[in-house]
């Protein structure tokens, strides 16, 4: 069985090509793990267009319809104009009740739109980690901590260090996040995780992360140097994942 897995990953690596390495994207288009941001950065001069399915357990507690959580989708456009900055624009579908008497369709979709930014003031060195600061939906204002529309509003600082072990890469990531809205309090505080990139499949990666409330596992890879795929399980049960097209500007 181990031989079959190794053969599969090697095939994925060959499809991806040897010139591009995976730099996993979180669901906002900003480089990170699955839910937790890191101090890694996208290649300079690249744009990324993608879409993700977000399980109801993956989204803020306030995203409910008739008292229940629901799965949704988002899409984003992200750019990395310089080695030290990333920007993205994210649109997420929201489920709302309709205002008419159409019994055939009692709900409709709205959208939450917001910007994300990440800055890396310190690049990774031999003896020190990379450091980054960032924000998701930083321009959102809330009158109180119930934060009716501040679904994703948060700020963070992250550190990342990579170790080379006989050609295999092990990444260690530590993040502190502050979500302003009380309904996202479960994600306030320390988060982090580890990433592993095998020597025989350098464009593929596995990760394990702790969000402050959940433990997530995921795998991702690049195919044909352009198409990024990520699939993960929240607490080993709830699937979220997506795809992204990366373009060199």
Range-by-range predicted roles:
Residues 115-117, 192, 221, 235-249:
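Outer-membrane beta-barrel "beta-signal"
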Residues 82-84, 214, 224-226, 236-238:
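A generic structural motif
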Residues 169-205:
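A mid-sequence, solvent-exposed acidic-amphipathic segment
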Residues 186-187, 195-198, 205, 209-216, ...:
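Contiguous ligand/interfacial binding patches
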Residues 23-155, 160-168, 178, 198-204, ...:
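Transmembrane beta-barrel domains of Gram-negative outer membranes and organellar outer membranes
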Residues 11, 17-19, 50, 134, ...:
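Small side chains
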Residues 163-165, 210-212, 236:
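A generic beta-sheet turn/junction motif
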Residues 1-30:
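Cleavable N-terminal export/targeting peptides
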């Amino acid at each position: 069985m181990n031989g079959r897995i190794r053969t599969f990953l090697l095939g994925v690596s060959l499809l991806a090509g040897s010139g591009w390495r995976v730099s996993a994207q979180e669901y906002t288009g900003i480089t990170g793990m699955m839910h937790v941001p890191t101090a890694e950065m996208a290649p300079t001069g690249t744009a990324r267009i993608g879409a993700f399915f977000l399980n109801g357990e993956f989204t803020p507690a306030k995203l409910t319809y008739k008292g229940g959580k629901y799965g949704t989708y988002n899409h984003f456009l992200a750019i990395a104009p310089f080695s030290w900055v990333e920007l993205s624009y994210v649109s997420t579908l929201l489920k709302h009740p309709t205002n008419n008497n159409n019994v055939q369709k009692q709900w409709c979709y709205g959208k939450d739109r917001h910007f994300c930014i990440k800055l890396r003031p310190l690049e990774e060195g031999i003896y020190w980690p990379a450091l980054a600061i960032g924000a998701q939906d930083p321009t959102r204002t809330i009158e109180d901590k119930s934060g009716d529309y501040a679904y994703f509003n948060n700020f963070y600082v992250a550190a990342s260090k990579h170790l080379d072990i006989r050609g295999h890469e092990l990444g260690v990531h530590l993040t502190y996040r502050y979500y302003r809205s009380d309904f996202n309090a479960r994600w306030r505080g320390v988060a982090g995780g580890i990433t592993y990139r095998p020597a025989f499949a350098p464009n593929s990666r596995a990760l394990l992360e702790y969000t402050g409330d959940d433990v997530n596992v995921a795998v991702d890879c690049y195919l044909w140097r352009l198409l990024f795929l990520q699939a993960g399980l929240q607490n080993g049960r709830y699937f979220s994942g997506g795809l992204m097209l990366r373009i060199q500007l």
